[in-house]
């Protein structure tokens, strides 16, 4: 069994390069290429802001290769990635193919693309089916992931796409392709 963790939390403080190195030094076998910085989403305004992050620029694949090499130099590999979010934003959806490309370039085998929390399995399947031919060409599987919504009035989590085992299976069955897999995020499951 291999253990991995995402680099997003550390990269906010020290950048992706050091984050990969620190994940290795912490004893993990692999790293999750967290690509949330590819798009700077303002949650209060509900809009994408301009960013100068390397993943948003024209040399994004060179940046992915650089991170891969840092991992290899430190004895770990990229096993998976997280595409930018939220999926409900059409402008962010336009970056999903870039995220799949970066996953392949970094050596990852799975790119996690969150379902749209408020869409049905059939509606989310349309998005995944549109991306699957490109993902297959890159040799990367797409993973859907268990999600949650928050009810401010009740101060508790409430239903979202893939929040239950039934919804998770419904999403996988709606696509019915071995290149769409499931990622159970235990941080989302609490």
Feature annotation, model-predicted:
Residues 1-109, 136, 173, 177-181:
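N-terminal pre-domain/capping segments
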Residues 2, 18, 31, 130-190:
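Acidic/histidine-rich catalytic cores of soluble enzymes
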Residues 9-11, 35-37, 84-87, 116-119, ...:
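Active-site-proximal loop/turn and secondary-structure-junction residues that shape catalytic pockets
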Residues 41-42, 119-128:
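Active-site-adjacent beta->alpha loops and helix N-cap segments on the catalytic face
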Residues 44, 91, 123-124, 154-155:
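Short, well-ordered secondary-structure micro-motifs
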Residues 59-63, 93-98, 124-129, 161-166:
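Charged helix-capping and loop-helix junction motifs
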Residues 91, 119, 159:
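Short, surface-exposed alpha-helical recognition segments that flank or form part
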Residues 103-122, 138, 143-154:
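Active-site groove signature of glycoside hydrolases
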């Amino acid at each position: 069994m291999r253990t991995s963790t995402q680099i997003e939390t550390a990269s906010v403080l020290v950048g992706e390069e050091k984050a990969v190195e620190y994940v290795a030094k912490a004893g993990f076998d692999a790293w999750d290429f967290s690509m949330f910085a590819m798009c700077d989403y303002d949650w209060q305004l509900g809009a994408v802001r301009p960013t100068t992050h390397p993943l948003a620029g024209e040399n994004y694949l060179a940046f992915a290769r650089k991170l891969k090499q840092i991992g290899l130099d430190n004895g770990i590999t990229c096993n998976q990635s997280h595409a930018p979010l939220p999926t409900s934003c059409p402008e962010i959806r336009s970056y999903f193919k870039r995220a799949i490309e970066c996953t392949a370039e970094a050596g990852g085998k799975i790119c996690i693309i969150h379902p749209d929390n408020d869409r049905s399995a059939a509606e989310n399947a349309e998005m995944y089916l549109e991306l699957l031919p490109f993902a297959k060409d890159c040799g990367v599987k797409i993973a859907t992931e268990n999600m949650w919504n928050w009810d401010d009035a009740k101060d508790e989590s409430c239903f979202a796409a893939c929040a239950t085992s039934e919804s998770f299976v419904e999403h996988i069955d709606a696509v019915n392709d071995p290149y769409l897999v499931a990622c159970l995020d235990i941080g989302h499951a609490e």
